[in-house]
Swiss-Prot record:
Its cofactor is [4Fe-4S] cluster. One of its GO terms (molecular function) is oxidoreductase activity, acting on iron-sulfur proteins as donors. Catalytic subunit of the ferredoxin-thioredoxin reductase (FTR), which catalyzes the two-electron reduction of thioredoxins by the electrons provided by reduced ferredoxin. This is Ferredoxin-thioredoxin reductase catalytic chain, chloroplastic. It comes from Zea mays (Maize).
Length: 152
């Protein structure tokens, strides 16, 4: 007698066996992250927190935002997104094999170690006055960030 086990598509398009045939009798679970109705408000709050942090840190470190405010806006939005999803403002301008491990290590959490030690910001968020791309501003409005990032 032959038995056939049918599969269904699970998380990430991977096949999974039906619950009745799962190994060791435990059902397989898949966490699906969905945006709730209040997700935009939550993200707006994080963007505002990161905006205020960026302005304060720029003043404290005597650095300036990029002359192209779109760069500043995108980086602040990326920091806010990482703060929401990872619990820390991990530098959004780098590739990580394991973001959770990077957050735990803290090296690339904003302000990152190179910024704190040598005033070197890979993201071009905090630029020294002698940098060719440095603007004259240490402030950016929430509206500027929303407008610049609404296209993405």
């Amino acid at each position: 007698m032959t038995s056939t086990v049918t599969t269904t598509v699970g998380c990430g398009g991977l096949p999974v066996r039906p619950l009745s045939t799962a190994t060791r009798g435990r059902p397989r679970r898949c966490a699906v992250r969905a945006q709730a109705a209040g997700a935009d408000a939550s993200n707006d709050k994080s963007v505002e927190v990161m905006r205020k942090f960026s302005e304060q840190y720029a003043r404290r470190s005597n650095t300036f935002f990029c002359a192209d405010k779109t760069v500043t806006a995108v980086v602040i939005k990326g920091l806010a997104d990482h703060r929401d999803t990872l619990g820390a403002p991990l530098c959004p301008c780098r590739h990580y094999d394991d973001k959770a491990a990077e957050v735990a290590q803290g090296f690339w959490n904003c302000p990152c170690v190179p910024m704190r030690e040598r005033k070197e910001c890979h993201c071009m968020l905090f630029l020294t006055p002698d940098n060719d791309f440095a603007g004259k501003d240490q402030v950016i409005s929430f509206e500027e960030i929303k407008e610049a990032t609404s296209k993405f």
